Every structure is written in C-alpha cells, then in structure tokens.
C-alpha cells in the first residue's frame, strides 16, 4: 500500500491504489479499473467495468471461404477509439499512467497483422500491448479461476474462441500449484463451430476424444490427486472461458427454482447435469427451451450459436478424461488472473467471504465470535461453518440493525445474492447461500411464505454439492449458529460485549435417543424398533449460564432464550444432530 503523507488528499490516496486493465480477448475487449489497496485486494473490487462486444477471432476469417485474413482496418480503428475512451476514463478516476496494463491473448497473438494492430494501439494511446504466450495465458487463466474461489483443487479447462487449455490446479493457503506442461488444443468454440459446418461431426468427436486422451497424460496429474479422486468419486472440474460460461447460464436457465440466477461465478453442477446437457446439444444441435420470445439470460445470439459446438466438445472430452464429479464455473479472466498473480502470499491466503464482510464488523467482533464458539462442539461442527460462516456471521451481525423489524430477516437472507456483499468476487454459490441462511436466523428467521420458499431453495444449493449427509449437517449447524447469534445480539445489541453477563457450556450426549425409541415402540412394529433403537445420534446439551438480575438479561432477553429452545428443538426433530438447550441462572 502507498505511504501516506500529511499533504495527501483522500482522492490522491484512493487514486494511487487504482489500476486499469484492458483484456483484449477472442470474443470481446474488457476494460476495468480495480483497487489494489491491501485491505481488500483479495476480492479485487472494481470501480469501473466496460466491454466492447467485438470478436477479434471471428473478424479474422472470411465468412464465405473460412480463409484466415488480417484484422480489418476499420476494426483496428474501432478498437483504438475504445482504447482512447478508456484512457480518458482512467484520467477521470486518477489512475496513474504507469498503473495501466493492456494484455492481449490468442486472437492478437495469432493475427496475421499482429504488429500493425499493436502499433496502432500504441500510437493512439501510448500504451504498450503485452501479448501473452500460450503458457502464460494458461497460467493467468488459472490464477483467474483460483481468485474466484476460496480454495481450488482439480482439473482446469478453458474454452476460448479459438483454442482450449487443459491443466490441473491445487490452491491452498495462498499457494498455487499447476501443471508445468499445460496443453493447448485448437478446439475453441468458434473454431469448432466453423468445422462443424464442413466436417463430419462423428469424426470430429473422435478426433477430440483421442487428442484429450493424449493431453490428460501430458499434463501429469499428481498421484495424490488421482488417489483422492478415486476415494471421492471423481475430480472437480474448474472451468472458465465464454463457451463454458454460456453452458453455465443455459444450465441455470433450465434449473427452475434455482435461487441465484444472475451470478455465474461460483455456480456448480453435477457431472450428470452437465453431461446430459452436452449430449443433448451435440445430438439435437439446438438449445432446449430457447426461442425468439424466450432468450437465455447472458447468452448472446453469437454465443447461442456456439453452444452445440461446446456440447460436442464436452461430450468428447468427458469420454477421454478421468471421472468428473462436479463442474464449477468461474468468471475469473485476465483481469482477475493478472491482479491475483501479483498479490503477496498472505493476501492470496485470505478468505474472500471474510474480507467482503469485514468492513461491516462491530468493533468487538472477535468477542462475539468467541462467545458464539462457546456454544459449538468444536470437534464435530463442519469446518466451513466454524471457520468461514461463523466469523462472517459475526462481521455482518448488525448490518441490518437500522432496518424495520419485519424486513431484517428477509434482507439478511439476500445479503450475498442481492445485498451488500452480492458483488464480492471469490464467493461460491454455496457460501452465498450459507451466509444468507445464517444471517436470516440471526434476526429470528420470521419471514413470509415466499421468502421461506427462497430459503429452502438456498438450502438446496448447499445440498446439491458433495456428500448429502454432510451437506445436511452443514445446513443444520448454519441455522444453529444463526439462532445462537439471535440470543447473543439480543443481550449485547450495541456491538459491545461485557464480561460475565452470560456464556455457554457444551457437553456431549452419545447415548441412544430414548424419546425416539419410545415413539417407534408406540407407532411401529417390533422389528422396526430394533433397527431404529440402535441408531445413535450426535447429541449435545448446551447450557446457557445467565445472570438472574442483570439488566441486560431482562424479560425480552429471556423470551429470546425461550425462542432459542423452541427453534433448536424444532431443528433437532428428525435430524441426526441433536442439541438440547438448558438454562442456568446465577446470582452475582
């Protein structure tokens, strides 16, 4: 971060931390101005974004003969005009001249008149164009995907206009490992669309399949990743590029009731969902459910034409690469990848959810978190709830305090899908759903029927991924910590925690649930009783130790504790997780 002096104005300080990036891609040119200030660099907040929907890839091919040709002069002129406009915008924001990067990829690199194009940009703006080599382009693309999530582990696939890139990636604690031999193949969405018009599609399918059989060997997947994939039912596939984002938007369009339709970054689907759609597009050569009257959100006419080609490509790839269990979609591109590549390890290691929620944290948020964690069995709670959702919940605990009472839980439910952290880069749909569910419970969870349906849809987002039993536990404990915070924030509503007002004590109960056994004895046959009565539940008793006479624990607070008992009892009903809330009053 820049050094401050007494003469610095706020505008000068902000401007010094801004950087401009121009991403000259195959299917469009993206302009952005981002902040690289250390306190929020991990989530790369943008102050300006724009895009020129100009395909440098397509303009290099004759529409009649498919012969390659130079980038037309009028297109170069149009690009230079857009560049000059962005230069003025950078001046308006105060972006230092040395903090603007112009980065070009495949479409520029392979252009017949690449030098003419680059010189024209320099002549009109004074900006030099960095043309990434093939390996650098893959590396930056991987960084873009890694920046889009908290952790990434699995295979990496980028489908651009002219080519595709395959690699593997592991990111954890700020370190990024990837293949030293990534493979690029000429099967981009635009390339395949042209070939499908002239080539035999069956032959093309087998060509891609064989090429990817070789490619998967060349990238050298580490044995530990192969072993883990065997245990877990397959690899996660992390994707980027316009062709695959188009597939993601199509799958969202087809998923009736899916609650996060407008954010593609962080969306995940099962292998079965993705594979079925790929096969349909390949075999039918059309998009299901699409018409002139019903266009797919964020899928342009040009992208829609390419989707059958993407379907053919993915159908072939899936027959060549190891088993995939889930497909993850990323919006991280050259902007995000180039910024992330420059971040120090300690900033890369930060959790995007905690960085996004930190500006809203009460002064003593650590005390709230400490008190919350005294109500949690640390050894059994899912890691995502304890390490990510609980701290973010404490950060956001009072952000809706000024809202009308009846609006608070509803606004909280939407906090990461339409609310104050919805625009944060780096959040999966699962994380967005969980923090909304937790924060809604923190405000009591009293929401109208339509919002109750939305809440259930958010739960389904969580249940779609991974092991179903573990996902159910994650949802359960997320609701639990939100309900506990409802009481904590009722006792301490001012963002300040006084010592010795109340605390929690957790004890484990691992015995067979007697009440469940009795219910089955009354209502079912003897055989069923035997099977069910031996089932053990994870049982805990949480005692709220509270001062009898403290003003902060008056009738209104005691009423919250009664509500807590009811809500946790309801949560525990029919669940493997069982928590009983007890109350112990003491005199000071």
From Swiss-Prot:
It comes from the Eukaryota. GO terms for biological process: maintenance of DNA trinucleotide repeats; mitochondria-nucleus signaling pathway; positive regulation of transcription by RNA polymerase II; protein import into nucleus; protein localization to nucleus; regulation of transcription by RNA polymerase II. Gene3D superfamilies: 3.30.420.40, Exopolyphosphatase. Domain 2. GO terms for cellular component: cytoplasm; euchromatin. One of its GO terms (molecular function) is phosphoprotein binding. Pfam families: Ppx-GppA, RTG2_C. Present with 3260 molecules/cell in log phase SD medium. Belongs to the GppA/Ppx family. Required for a novel path of interorganelle communication between mitochondria, peroxisomes and the nucleus, thereby maintaining a functional metabolic interaction between the tricarboxylic acid and glyoxylate cycles. In particular, required for the retrograde expression of the peroxisomal isoform of citrate synthase, CIT2. This is Retrograde regulation protein 2. It comes from Saccharomyces cerevisiae (strain ATCC 204508 / S288c).
């Amino acid at each position: 971060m820049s050094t401050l002096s007494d003469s610095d104005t706020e505008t000068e300080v902000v401007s010094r931390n801004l950087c401009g990036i121009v991403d000259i891609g195959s299917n469009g040119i993206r302009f952005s101005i981002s902040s690289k200030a250390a306190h929020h660099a991990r989530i790369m907040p943008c102050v300006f974004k724009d895009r020129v929907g100009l395909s440098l890839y397509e303009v290099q091919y004759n529409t009649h003969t498919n012969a390659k040709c130079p980038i037309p002069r009028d297109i170069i002129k149009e690009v230079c005009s857009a560049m000059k406009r962005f230069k003025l915008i950078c001046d308006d924001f105060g972006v230092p001249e040395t903090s603007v990067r112009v980065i070009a990829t495949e479409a520029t690199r392979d252009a017949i008149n690449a030098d003419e194009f680059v010189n024209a940009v320099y002549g009109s703006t004074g900006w030099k164009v960095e043309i990434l080599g093939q390996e650098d382009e893959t590396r930056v693309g991987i960084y873009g995907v890694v920046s889009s999530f908290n952790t990434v582990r699995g295979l990496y696939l980028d489908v651009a206009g002219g080519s595709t890139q395959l690699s593997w990636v592991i990111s954890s604690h700020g370190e990024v490992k990837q293949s030293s031999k990534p493979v690029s193949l000429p099967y981009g969405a635009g390339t395949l669309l042209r070939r499908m018009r002239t080539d035999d599609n069956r032959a093309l399918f087998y060509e891609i399949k064989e090429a990817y059989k070789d490619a998967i060997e060349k990238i050298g997947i580490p044995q530990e990743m192969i072993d883990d994939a065997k245990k877990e039912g397959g690899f996660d596939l992390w994707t980027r590029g316009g062709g695959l984002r188009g597939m993601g938007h199509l799958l969202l369009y087809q998923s009736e009731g899916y609650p996060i339709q407008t954010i593609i970054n962080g969306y995940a689907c099962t292998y079965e969902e993705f594979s079925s759609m790929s096969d349909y597009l390949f075999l039918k050569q059309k998009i299901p459910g699409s018409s002139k009257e019903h266009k797919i959100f964020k899928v342009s006419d040009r992208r829609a034409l390419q989707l059958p080609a993407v379907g053919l490509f993915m159908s072939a790839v899936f027959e060549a690469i190891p088993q995939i269990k889930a497909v993850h979609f990323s919006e991280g591109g050259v902007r995000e990848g180039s910024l992330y590549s420059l971040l120090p390890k300690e900033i890369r290691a930060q959790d995007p959810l905690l960085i996004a929620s930190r500006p809203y944290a009460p002064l003593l948020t650590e005390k709230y978190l400490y008190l919350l964690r005294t109500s949690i069995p640390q050894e059994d709670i899912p890691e995502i709830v304890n390490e990510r959702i609980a701290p973010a919940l404490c950060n956001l605990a009072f952000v809706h305090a000024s809202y009308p009472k009846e609006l608070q839980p509803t606004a909280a439910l939407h906090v990461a899908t339409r609310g104050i952290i919805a625009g944060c880069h780096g959040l999966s749909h699962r994380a967005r759903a969980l923090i909304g569910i937790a924060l809604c419970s923190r405000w009591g969870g009293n929401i109208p029927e339509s919002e109750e349906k939305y809440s259930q849809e958010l739960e389904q987002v969580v249940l779609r991924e991974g092991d179903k039993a573990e996902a159910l536990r994650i949802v359960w404990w997320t609701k639990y910590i939100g309900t506990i915070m409802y009481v904590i924030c009722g006792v301490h509503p001012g963002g300040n925690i006084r010592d010795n007002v109340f605390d929690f004590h957790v004890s484990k109960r691992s015995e067979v649930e007697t009440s469940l056994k009795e219910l089955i004895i009354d209502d079912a046959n003897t055989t069923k009783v035997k099977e069910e009565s031996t089932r053990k539940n994870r049982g805990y008793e949480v005692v709220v130790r509270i001062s009898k006479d403290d003003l902060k624990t008056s009738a209104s607070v005691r009423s919250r504790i009664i509500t807590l008992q009811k809500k946790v009892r309801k949560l525990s009903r029919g669940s493997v997780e069982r928590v009983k809330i007890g109350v112990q009053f003491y005199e000071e």
